């Protein structure tokens, strides 16, 4: 999507009043600003600013001690460029919104290489220079948990009302019990052009895996993965759950992983 296409996209969706302008940090967490749609041009023209340091925070969103991007520069801003990924609807918030994906550049126009998306783009350029095309897909595992508990515990089934208490790998019952949640995940993936494929229940109670299809663009595959994680968490909250992609939320149950399938075509 170009900056010229974005206003037409919003005009077709008059219910949208807010845009989440976001950048992916080094931990795969989306960070950014809530911006009124009147500032769309600022987002798509590369005029929006955010601190360069936001890309190197820890997983809790705090500055790393002695981070030169904070103290040595006075926490200087960088400029945020529109990546060109189409604006996408966010329907799990209290009001409909849109999502815009950005990446950072320096004041002089150079890509900011502390941005993981910029770093990946540089690697992809090296493959292209060799006449090679990476083809990439991801598989993401996550748990649905009960957010009301002080410590993670499996959720109650929306069908039976009983808490899940056993592991159920490839359980059709577990898929069907969480059918409303999974249906909305797939709808959101379609709306955000994320190529969601098969879903299975995994080895842990309330654990699922959803595969994303192969694409011949590592940047697109990485974008798909981080946006997928965000929408799963958002839709889980809408349904009264919490979702976690944490590697080991339970000490006595199977952990969650992310599998990356990677091929090179010449």
Q: Which positions does each model-derived feature cover?
A:
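A short, mixed-charge helix-start or loop-turn motif at secondary-structure junctions
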Residues: 167-168, 213-215
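A short mid-domain helix/strand-loop element embedded in enzyme catalytic domains
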Residues: 196-211
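Short, solvent-exposed loop/turn segments at the edges of secondary structure
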Residues: 95-97, 137, 203-205, 255-259
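ATP/Mg2+-dependent ligation/transfer catalytic cores
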Residues: 1-198, 220
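A short glycine-rich, hydrophobically flanked beta-strand micro-motif that places a catalytic Asp/Glu
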Residues: 138-141, 198-201, 242-250
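Acidic, glycine-rich loop-and-beta core segments that form the ion-binding/anion-interacting portion
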Residues: 207, 212, 218-266
